[in-house]
Structure formats: structure tokens, C-alpha cells
UniProtKB/Swiss-Prot annotation:
Residues 26-260 are annotated as: Disordered. The keyword Lipoprotein does not apply. This is Translation initiation factor IF-2. Residues 488-490 are annotated as: G5. Residues 29-55, 96-112, 203-227 have a biased composition (Basic and acidic residues). Pfam families: EF-G_D2, GTP_EFTU, IF-2, IF2_assoc, IF2_N. The keyword Aminoacyl-tRNA synthetase does not apply. Residues 343-512 form the tr-type G domain.
Length: 843
């Protein structure tokens, strides 16, 4: 064996050579290759190492032995049926041999009584051995002799009780072995939890009779205690006996001595349940804290970032505001706009008051008839046009001048380089003119004032300069920095000078763009075309937009299927400062959204989905919350009349303007609720929604399809088409006026003065009166005034003149008046006759 190598040793023990080498190195042996020799000493060291690593002790395993005994018996029940019950008793005992203690220490520790107890234990051990032998010999005989007496107990234990049924011998059991076994059963601390390891060395019993008897006594006592607790199962009893009852395994949680302060990461919107989870507290505690702060919320309600930060600070933690735009930032940072820069055409927005000639001026420049195509002769969309001039190219954006299109004008100012402010020379500065000036200043865009209609009678250009100077727009002739150009959209006077002024301002701005970069820009308008799907009018501000590019615009994305310029022609690519219609998006983006071209469609979809989820969360967070200060005001909202409207428009910008104008019409008595709004024709879904919500179907420059018309005719819905925003708003106002509660106005029709009072047998007190004002009518409401103080209000019961009942008495005539249910009429009182008139209200 001394010449055995590692390889031979591995094949002998059935181990892999590499694994055996690892174990030998862990044991501290110097073997590294399979050819190294293995001695008997090396094998012994390896065996001791493996024994220790498997939770055993090389010395302790020799001092512990586990014996298992199975005893089978059969008893018959005493109920007369002759039923036999098989009983199997399993016994498992582990014996531990203590290491002998030094005689000197034992002698020093033991006292006189201890020695006496030891002598008694040794004397009683012989008796215990004899009793154990007698018990083992008579076990089966005693079981058969007392089968009928133990049948009930065996059935109660369900024939599987861990305590043996037949183990009830009549031999006397001495009590002393419990005390006598104390010097022998003191085991290592692991004794209460009896191990059952595989591969454990079993040894023969040497002196285990007395200890076995003591274990049986303890086992019996534990069994009696377990039988007293009927709630424990057999499995838990066996587990408890194996684990020693859990008396030594006392575990528990300790309460923190100081409050734990956590750093809570808060996104832009978070639900109450998620916020409580981040702070490791219950959600009802967060709800209570917010209730004390004046906000009543539910567990699933979404709150914004600022509110959540206040709540976290109130709960004693540190808020950490987190931005959720990491994915967007990653996509945007991957786009490079570096390259050779070129001078691009300026983007010019035409703004001004309605009917001041903005579109007509642009029409003359383009040499086309645009205004005649607009309903009512007013612009209701943002039109984007590219004009080639001999001095340079210019891109024009025509914005509406109506008051409802404030948001569209603001978007036009943000997407532009120069603003042309059109002011009629005969009309002067109007509200939308001032608003356009404010938009231009807010966007930091230079102004060029075009004083239009200069050829009309009554034109006063100096008046325009004077009025604009009050708003900070100073002419260059007056020492300012704003160019004023006198033009006429009808005759074309001053058009060239206006274009030269625009190009001059653009040269000063030094407008640059990188045509080789991916395109980016702004969405000017969007609509849902029945044949083409979602169509977005965009203005390219930088880069080049090509057919096939992947575009991310607001909440939507898609691959560009077609590019159509303002002339209706399809093009393959569009450069900077050029307007174009794109097809291929999965929806209609909001007007004013920025668009970019990304390289990866998967990234674009992820960003779009993230924005949609974020938009939904923010919208839910901004909804009206049930706060304490407005609870009472919300209680009376059910009594308010409501006009429900399902609105469909042709383009996104008009839809937004109309929706805002309708919501502004709401009053304290009548609310306008836009139940649903969208771009495109009226469908059957819209009609069904109008039926469910009892709403008016309104189409702005759109029509209903066949299914929608069938539902409208069947249900009798109110469907209205409009092409001018004036008419839409006026008719909604009329509908709201019809829902207003009418006013009742009191109108005094006559006054009579009491001259005398006399008694009538059937009526009672009758006032003899003189009509001093108006006409007194019978069966109308009256008031009795004494010294101009109302003392009674009731009804005129009888009206007579010379014993004749009459219907009315005019001024200057005498009459007798009987007041219903009132007899305290005195001379000098005045009787005032009035009528209630219904007055229709209007907004």
C-alpha cells in the first residue's frame, strides 16, 4: 500500500482524481499530481479531515452509538367482532460514553452527600439491570394477557402511538435510577438534539443498561405531557422530541432602540401603497399622515413627487427625488448633430388680430388663394409654407387670430425665428395683437411689424406706432429696434420691403443647421386622415428627414412611409427649415411636440411606451383630490346642470382650441363637460358613447360614418356639424342658457290705501280702500304694509264695488278688499298687489 499512487487510490475509493486532489490539499497534504505516492499516514489524515468537514469529530463518533429496535405484536379488540390490531413499536436510542475525568478533580469536587448518592446509585444499578431483563423477557406475554384491558388505549392512539402499548409490565420500577444515572448521562451540549447522521459508527453497548432505563422513564414522562395537549399533531410531537422540545432554542426579534431613518427614492409619481412600502411601514399610516395634512387619499391613489416628498419628511425619513427620464436621456445622448454647418432659411410666423389680413398678406406672397379655402374666411389651422424669393428662401407659419387659438399662437412663436406682427392701419392694436407681442417676447423672438391695409381710407400708421409703443414695441424711427413696414395685401405695396426686412433680421441672427445629421424639429399640426391614417405636419429645424427614418414624436413613434410637401408632392427627403407632412406614425401627436429621428426602432417604442405611462400617471395625479377644504363644495355639485359633449375635429390644434373654449364657458350653474375628444371622423364608438353619457355629438370639419348615422337616427341623438368656431361656441351658449333655472321677478301692479274698516258676516274684516296706484286684481298675491313695513303676505280673497264682485279696480276708484285669513286690517294701512313674472336667463 505504500507504493499506491493518487490515481490508484482514487480508483479504489471510486472518486474523481481531480476532486480527490482538491480534498487532499484541503486536508493539508502535499500531493499535487496523480502520480504522487499515498502512505497510510496520508490516508489517516485525509479521513480525519473528511470526518471533521462533515460535522463530526473523530473522537466523538467513537463515544456515541445509536441503536434501533422494532417490536411487533397483535392485540384483539374487546367489542366482540374479533378484530385484530397490529402494533409495531419502534425504539431508537443513542448512547454517549463520557470521557473519564481526572480522579483528583473528581475527588475535589464531590462532597460527602455526593459520594453517598454515588454509592446508592451503584447499588441500585444491579437492580435496574435485573428489572430490564425481566421486562424484555415478559413483554410479549404481558401484551397478550392484558390485550382486552389495553384495547381502548390502543385504539385511542390509532395503533401508531410512539409509546408501546405492550410496554406495561407488572414488575416494580425503582425510582432511584433517575438520581443514580446523573453522573452517567451528562453528555456534551448537543445531546438534547439527537443527531441521525448516515455513516455513523455503530458500536456495541458496554454499560448502557442503566442509562437505557433512565431514557425510557424520561420518554414516558414526555409522552404523558404530549398526550395532555390535544392540539399537537404526531408529526410535531416527533419533531419536538427529536429537537429537544425547543427549550434551548430561544429565538426572537429585538425592537430597535432608535428610529430607523431611510433614504426614500421618489419618482415623479407614486402610489400611496408603493410609498409606504419604500418606507417599510403600513399604508394606513401614510393615509393617516396625509389626512392630518389635509388630503384624503386611498391606498391605490397616485400622488405627485412634491406631495410624496412632504409626506416622507413628515414621517421622519429623507426624500430623494428621482427623475424617470433616464431612458430618454440615453436615446437623446446617442444622437450626434456634429458636422458641416450651412446657413438655413428663416422660419417666420405671421401673427396678429383676426381679420387684420395675415392670410391675405401671405397669400399675396405665395401668389395663391388660401383665405378663400378657409371656412368663414378666417384661419383655423397653422399653415406651413415654403417660399422661394430671389433674395433667399423663407418658411412661413400662418397662425389663427381668433381668441380660442391662444395655444396655437404660442406654439408658433416657439418654433419660429422671426415674428411678423400684422396690424390693420384702420383698426389699430387689438387684444390678439397684444397677446402676439407677449408670445414673441416670451419666446425671445425679434419682431417685424407689418402695418397692413395702408391703402384704405382712415388708415393711421402713426396711431399703430403710438399704441404699440405702450407695450414696449418701439419703432426704429423713434429710436427703437423694431422695423415697421407699411404694406397692402390687396395691392402688393411694400411686400418686397417686408421680405427684405425679414432677410435682414435673419442675417443678423446667423441661422445655421447641419444637413447631414438626423432630423429633429417640432410638430406643427396633426390629423387623422381616413385614407392615409395619422398624418403630422412637422417643421424640420435641424438635420435631414428621409423616407424610411424612424421618428419619435411625443407619445408616438413610427417609420416614415411618405413625405408630402405643402404643394402635395411626394419627396424623398426634406432639409432644415422645411415644412412637410409625414405618414407612418402610430397615432396623432400633440401639436407642439418635438420630434427626433432615432436609429433603433426598439428604443423608440420603449421611449414612447414610457412617455404614455408617465403621461397617464401625471394625469391621474393631477385629477381633483377630495380635500377637506372643498368637501362641502363637492356635495352640491350633483345639483349643477351639465352639458355633455362628444367632440371630434379634423386637426389636433383646432381640437385643443375648441375644447379649451368650451370648458371656459362653464359657470357655477351650468358645466360644460367634454366627455370625449379626438381627431378624425365620427364613428359608431363615438355615437354609443354619446348615448351612454347623454351627450351632444359635435363634428368640426368632420362627418359621421354609416354606423354612427344609424345609431344617431335610432337613438335620436343631437348631431351637429360646424366649420366655423364662432357658430359652435354660440350654439353651445344657447344650449347652456336653456338649462339655466329661470328667474322670477316680482312686479307691483297696484297699491290701495285703507280708508275704513267694517265687518261683514261671512267674510270678516273688510277694508274700504282707495286705489292710489296701478290696478288691483282679484286672486293675486298681496302684502299688507303698515308704516312701510310688511306685516302680512297672502292672497286677495274678495274684491267688491257697491256690493258687486268685480275682477279689477283701477286707480282713483273705491273698493272693498277682503284679505284671506287676516282680520287685523287698520285704517292707514296700504295693500300692495303684486305679480310674479318669469324671466328667461342667458349667459
Amino acid at each position: 500500500m505504500s507504493d499506491m499512487t493518487v490515481k490508484d487510490f482514487a480508483s479504489k475509493v471510486g472518486r474523481d482524481v481531480s476532486r480527490l486532489l482538491e480534498q487532499m490539499q484541503e486536508a493539508g497534504l502535499p500531493h499535487k499530481t496523480e502520480g504522487d505516492a499515498v502512505s497510510e499516514e496520508d490516508k489517516q489524515r485525509l479521513l480525519e479531515h473528511l470526518t471533521r468537514s462533515h460535522g463530526g469529530d473523530s473522537g466523538a463518533t467513537k463515544n456515541r452509538v445509536t441503536l434501533t429496535r422494532n417490536t411487533k405484536s397483535r392485540i384483539r379488540s374487546g367489542d366482540g367482532r374479533g378484530k385484530a390490531i397490529d402494533v409495531q413499536v419502534r425504539k431508537k436510542r443513542t448512547y454517549v460514553k463520557r470521557e473519564p475525568e481526572p480522579a483528583e478533580e473528581k475527588a475535589a469536587e464531590e462532597t460527602g452527600p455526593r459520594q453517598l448518592v454515588g454509592d446508592m446509585a451503584s447499588a441500585n444499578q444491579a437492580k435496574a439491570d435485573e428489572a430490564a431483563k425481566a421486562e424484555q423477557a415478559a413483554a410479549e406475554q404481558a401484551a397478550k394477557a392484558k390485550a382486552e384491558e389495553e384495547a381502548a388505549a390502543a385504539a385511542a392512539s390509532k395503533a401508531a402511538e410512539s409509546e408501546p402499548v405492550a410496554e406495561a409490565p407488572g414488575a416494580p420500577q425503582p425510582e432511584e435510577p433517575e438520581t443514580a444515572s446523573e453522573p452517567f448521562v451528562e453528555a456534551p451540549p448537543k445531546e438534547p438534539r439527537t443527531p441521525n447522521r448516515r455513516g455513523q459508527n455503530h458500536q456495541k453497548k458496554d454499560t448502557g443498561r442503566g442509562r437505557k432505563r433512565d431514557d425510557d422513564e424520561e420518554r414516558r414522562e414526555r409522552g404523558e405531557r404530549r398526550r395532555g395537549n390535544a392540539k399537537k399533531t404526531k408529526r410535531s410531537e416527533r419533531r419536538g422530541s427529536r429537537r429537544g422540545g425547543g427549550r434551548d432554542n430561544q429565538h426572537g426579534f429585538q425592537k430597535p432602540t432608535q428610529p430607523i431613518v431611510r433614504e426614500v427614492a421618489i419618482p415623479e409619481s407614486i402610489s400611496v401603497a408603493d410609498l409606504a412600502d419604500k418606507m417599510s411601514i403600513k399604508a394606513n399610516e401614510v393615509i393617516k399622515a396625509m389626512f392630518t395634512m389635509g388630503a384624503a387619499v386611498t391606498i391605490n391613489q397616485t400622488i405627485d413627487q412634491d406631495t410624496a416628498a412632504i409626506v416622507v419628511e413628515e414621517m421622519g425619513h429623507k426624500p430623494k427625488l428621482v427623475k424617470d427620464d433616464a431612458l430618454e436621456t440615453e436615446v437623446l445622448e446617442g444622437i450626434s448633430y456634429e458636422g458641416e454647418e450651412i446657413t438655413r432659411a428663416p422660419v417666420v410666423t405671421v401673427m396678429g388680430h383676426v381679420d387684420h389680413g395675415k392670410t391675405s398678406l401671405l397669400d399675396y406672397i405665395r401668389r395663391t388663394k388660401v383665405a378663400t379655402g378657409e371656412a368663414g374666411g378666417i384661419t383655423q389651422h397653422i399653415g406651413a409654407y415654403h417660399v422661394e424669393h430671389e433674395s433667399g428662401d423663407i418658411t412661413f407659419l400662418d397662425t389663427p387670430g381668433h381668441a380660442a387659438f391662444t395655444a396655437m399662437r404660442a406654439r408658433g412663436a416657439q418654433a419660429t425665428d422671426v415674428v411678423i406682427l400684422v396690424v390693420a392701419a384702420d383698426d389699430g392694436v387689438m387684444p390678439q395683437t397684444v397677446e402676439a407681442v407677449e408670445h414673441a417676447k416670451a419666446a425671445g423672438v425679434p419682431l417685424v411689424v407689418a402695418v397692413n391695409k395702408i391703402d384704405k381710407e382712415g388708415a393711421d400708421p402713426d396711431r399703430v406706432k403710438n399704441e404699440l409703443s405702450q407695450y414696449g414695441v418701439i419703432s426704429e424711427a423713434w429710436g427703437g429696434d423694431t422695423q415697421f413696414v407699411h404694406v397692402s395685401a390687396k395691392s402688393g405695396e411694400g411686400i418686397d420691403a417686408l421680405l427684405e426686412a425679414i432677410l435682414l433680421v435673419s442675417e443678423v441672427l446667423e441661422l445655421k443647421a447641419v444637413p447631414e445629421a438626423p432630423a429633429k424639429g417640432v410638430v406643427v399640426e396633426s390629423q387623422l386622415d381616413k385614407g392615409r391614417g395619422p398624418v403630422a405636419t412637422v417643421l424640420v429645424q435641424n438635420g435631414t428627414l428621409k423616407r424610411g427614418d424612424i421618428v419619435l414624436a411625443g407619445l408616438h413613434y413610427g417609420r416614415v412611409r411618405a413625405l408630402v410637401n405643402e404643394l402635395g408632392k411626394r419627396v424623398e427627403e426634406v432639409g432644415p427649415a422645411m415644412p412637410v407632412e409625414i405618414q407612418g406614425l402610430d397615432g396623432t401627436p400633440e401639436a407642439g411636440d418635438e420630434f427626433i429621428v432615432v436609429a433603433d426602432e426598439k428604443k423608440a417604442r420603449e421611449v414612447a411606451n414610457f412617455r404614455q405611462g408617465k403621461y397617464r400617471e401625471v394625469r391621474l395625479a393631477r385629477q381633483q383630490k377630495a380635500k377637506l377644504e372643498n368637501m362641502f363644495s363637492q356635495m352640491g355639485q350633483d345639483e349643477v346642470a351639465k352639458v355633455n359633449i362628444v367632440l371630434k375635429a379634423d386637426v389636433q390644434g383646432s381640437l385643443e382650441a375648441i375644447r379649451g373654449a368650451l370648458e371656459e364657458l362653464s359657470t357655477d350653474e351650468v358645466k360644460v363637460a367634454v366627455v370625449s375628444s379626438g381627431v378624425g371622423g365620427i364613428t359608431g364608438t363615438d355615437a354609443n358613447l354619446a348615448v351612454a353619457s347623454e351627450a351632444i355629438l359635435v363634428g368640426f370639419n368632420v362627418r359621421a360614418d354609416v354606423s354612427a348615422r344609424e345609431i344617431v337616427e335610432r337613438e335620436g341623438l343631437d348631431l351637429r356639424y360646424y366649420s366655423v368656431i364662432y357658430q359652435l361656441i354660440d350654439e353651445v351658449k344657447q344650449a347652456m342658457s336653456g338649462m339655466l333655472a329661470p328667474e322670477w321677478k316680482e312686479e307691483i301692479v297696484g297699491v290701495a290705501e285703507v280708508r275704513d274698516v267694517f265687518k261683514a258676516p261671512k267674510i270678516g274684516a273688510v277694508a274700504g280702500c282707495m286705489v292710489v296706484e296701478g290696478t288691483v286684481y282679484r286672486h293675486k298675491r298681496i302684502r299688507v304694509l303698515r308704516e312701510n313695513v310688511v306685516i302680512y303676505e297672502g292672497e286677495l280673497e274678495s274684491l267688491r264695488r257697491y256690493k258687486d264682485d268685480i275682477g279689477e279696480v283701477r286707480s282713483g276708484m273705491e273698493c272693498g278688499i277682503g284679505v284671506k285669513n287676516y282680520n287685523d286690517v287698520q285704517v292707514g294701512d296700504k295693500i300692495e298687489v303684486f305679480d310674479q313674472v318669469k324671466v328667461e336667463r342667458s349667459l
